Amino acid sequence: MNGVVIPQTPIAVDFWSLRRAGTARLFFLSHMHCDHTVGLSSTWARPLYCSPITAHLLHRRLQVSKQWIRALEIGESHVLLLDEIGQETMTVTLIDANHCPGSVMFLFEGYFGTILYTGDFRYTPSMLKEPALTLGKQIHTLYLDNTNCNPALVLPSRQEATQQIIQLIRQFPQHNIKIGLYSLGKESLLEQLALEFQTWVVLSPQRLELVQLLGLADVFTVEEEAGRIHAVDHMEICHSAMLQWNQTHPTIAIFPTSRKIRSPHPSIYSIPYSDHSSYSELRAFVAALRPCQVVPIVREQPCGEFFQDSLSPRLSMPLIPHSVQQYMSSSSRKTNVFWQLERRLKRPRTQGVVFESPEEKADQVKVDRDSKKHKKESLSPWAGCLSRLCPHPLQARKQLFPDFCRKEGDEPVLFCDSNKMATVLTAPLELSVQLQPVDEFPFPETREEIGLGSPLWSGGGSGSPTRGKQSNGMGCGSPPTHISRTTHLTPESGGLALKYLLTPVDFLQAGFSSRNFDQQVEKHQRVQCNNPAVMNTVDDV
């Protein structure tokens, strides 16, 4: 990006990154080439100053809103405010840069002294006759286009390069001519070629609109077969395109540029026609202005050493007025706010099709398989029934049923010492299990302490339910029989795990939570204490 924020000022030229602009408040565009509009788009929402032609192209090509574009006439001086109270002002004058349609140089004058920003320009002696430069003004800082600032690079003038192109075309009187161009620039060259060879120049509709805006001669058309000279995008000229063109009609291609180009086809020619100043022209320009310092616009190519003998004594840095400092600081804060707002409002980008990696998918399948296997081994054979009937936490079920296994007939058995086991039945009353002795639980609690009127039934010798008594001889294979209420538990049947196991059916609801379990138990206890008859009754089956 060829742009700059001028230090100690609120001025930015060809610089469109608000996050990096810092204290910049006034933004200027020298011309519409893409390397000077990086970051500039239709979302731009700040005043922007440029020439009238650039203003038209800016709106047409980048869709920048007209409400932010400030077109300034070339050759006139314009006064702009540098603060919010109108105390400090500066004068900016636009000078034709002789580079492409709408390109200008900016001459800034204010508390910071006099600054000339050339942008991309092709020097001609007539520039020194501009009124803004003939008043004996001292240029304190010169921002110079140093694209061709190389003593080893010798370039002809535009007029000389144009004659070279004309001589080349005359060598191929029966050929079509393809001129490789960028989207903007060298329109005057096309006009000269059309007048020289008395032929139409075929353009794209977009470039035709531009030449009509510039008021050039009526020698341009969009009809492919109307003329032998065709202006095409420079990217279209390649080996395959040359083969295709020559199959229909003999064709040569010309690149009017000072850049070194490796020709991929023998019919492609390069002519050093440049829109940038040559080294000798830069030397003449700097020697005539005698600025205090030269700052290269193309930062990758330092050129200060070439102009040391043409500089005036450097002046001290100017002081920034207090009102301008406030103006610049407020601009910085607003810039950050605008950027944060834009970042929040920006919609997320739509993701494309994302394919899963086969390796990652295989690893995930293996992990899922191992997880299911571990879960199957960890749960008892009755885990499926318990998960459906008893909404107890998985950890509690693991603690309550640690030793279950299956026989060949899939009947549940428990390998244990029958002398140390208590036989109880849980609610819902569909399963018969054996628990460890209550004295082995870490926090023993009696029935009276927890207030459980838990349903309990025991099977007699015949397997039929018995009311009000607990069976002492019930085996593991006794079938469970469902009843709604049972007699009281003995005090020895308490225990921390029984809180979750020996629970009335009406407590086992969808909204059950272990967090409020104790509160529900206390409430149930108070109800039963107030109505003791309920605790001693059993509904008929």
UniProtKB/Swiss-Prot annotation:
Top-rank taxon, per record: Eukaryota
Domain notes: The TBM domain mediates interaction with TERF2.
Molecular-function GO terms, alphabetical: 5'-3' DNA exonuclease activity; 5'-3' exonuclease activity; beta-lactamase activity; damaged DNA binding; protein homodimerization activity; protein-containing complex binding
Family membership noted in the UniProt record: Belongs to the DNA repair metallo-beta-lactamase (DRMBL) family.
Covalent cross-link Glycyl lysine isopeptide (Lys-Gly) (interchain with G-Cter in SUMO2), where: 334
PANTHER family the record matches: 5' EXONUCLEASE APOLLO, DNA CROSS-LINK REPAIR PROTEIN PSO2/SNM1-RELATED
Subunit structure: Interacts with TERF2; the interaction is direct. Interacts with MUS81, MRE11 and FANCD2. Interacts with HSPA2, HSPA8 and HSPA14. Interacts with SPAG5.
Localization: Chromosome, Telomere; Nucleus; Cytoplasm, Cytoskeleton, Microtubule organizing center, Centrosome
Protein name as annotated: 5' exonuclease Apollo
Signal peptide: none
The EC number(s) this enzyme carries: 3.1.-.-, 3.5.2.6
Regions of compositional bias (Basic and acidic residues) in chain numbering: 358-371
Chain segments carrying region Disordered: 350-375, 450-489
Annotated source species: Rattus norvegicus
Transmembrane region(s): none
Keyword entries, A-Z: Chromosome, Cytoplasm, Cytoskeleton, DNA damage, DNA repair, Exonuclease, Hydrolase, Isopeptide bond, Nuclease, Nucleus, Telomere, Ubl conjugation
PTM text: Ubiquitinated, leading to its degradation. Interaction with TERF2 protects it from ubiquitination.
Principal localisation: nucleus
Enzymatic reactions: a beta-lactam + H2O = a substituted beta-amino acid
Enzyme category, top tier: hydrolase
GO CC annotation, single: nucleus
